[in-house]
Structure formats: structure tokens, C-alpha cells
Amino acid sequence: MTVMIVSEVAGQSAQGYDGMLAIVGDALRQAPGFIMHASHRVDAGWRIVELWASREDATQFFANHVAPHLPDGIRPKLSFQPLHSLVKP
């Protein structure tokens, strides 16, 4: 089932986010189950929204590619929401 993952990253800056995306971006684009990624600044830091084919695909990618590169003090708060619908072009 397609899931939406929202990552709230307190204390993250645009520079920190851009650096992380530079590290994991190619792997993300090729990851099994990956559908889309978007991000924006919030008052407390940064928010990332992703769509994945399954929660398992998302958590495996996070564990293998994101978590090993997180700087000290940066720990995203993840929430998962199964989607009722997804409309693609």
C-alpha cells in the first residue's frame, strides 16, 4: 500500500538538507518503491514529504542510506500515513 512519510527535522537548515540530498539523492531516485520527494522550511527546521510503494521500502532506505549520514543532534521525527488514493500523470 502506498504510504506518505513526513519527516520533521528540528534544527535542520537548507544547507544541511542540501548536503544530505547530495549524498543520498542518486540512491533515492533508484530505490525500490520510491515515488516522490519534496521538502520545505518550517519554523523549527525542515520538513520532508515522500511517497513510497510501502512502509518497508521507505524504512529500509532510511536505515541504509539516511541514518548513517545524519549529523550529531539531527534526528528526524517520522510519521507514516497509508494513502487512500494517489493520482499520477
List each language-model region with its residue ranges.
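Short S/T/G/P-rich N-terminal loop/turn motif that feeds into the first structured element of a domain
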Residues: 1-49, 53-67, 74-89
